[in-house]
Amino acid sequence: TLVDIIRVDHFRGFEAGWSIPAEAETAIDGVWVPAPGDELFREVKRRLGELPIIAEDLGLITPEVEALRVNHGFPGMKVLQFAFDSLDHGSTTFLPHNHEPASVVYTGTHDN
């Protein structure tokens, strides 16, 4: 084995990507375009076996992105710093007592 585990950044892009028309003045004119994530991960697993992947599931995570992660058995990410930066501390999924077993917990990321 060459690696123990790989963190896939911007995992949500495997479900859909934000497409912005070339003539648009701002990104607000974009639309979500489906991506072939499910087919891709099935084919890679078929060829390589189980994948040692952590899905970076931060940002705009839709039920479809969550389903893609769960259906392929990839753990997601929790960031402790996000838990204590929320105005609604009682419901944030980043608080330690709300973490799910299939999660990898980081104190922070390169972005914060």
Enumerate the language-model features and the residues they cover.
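Catalytic cores of glycan-processing enzymes that make or break glycosidic bonds
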Residues: 1-112
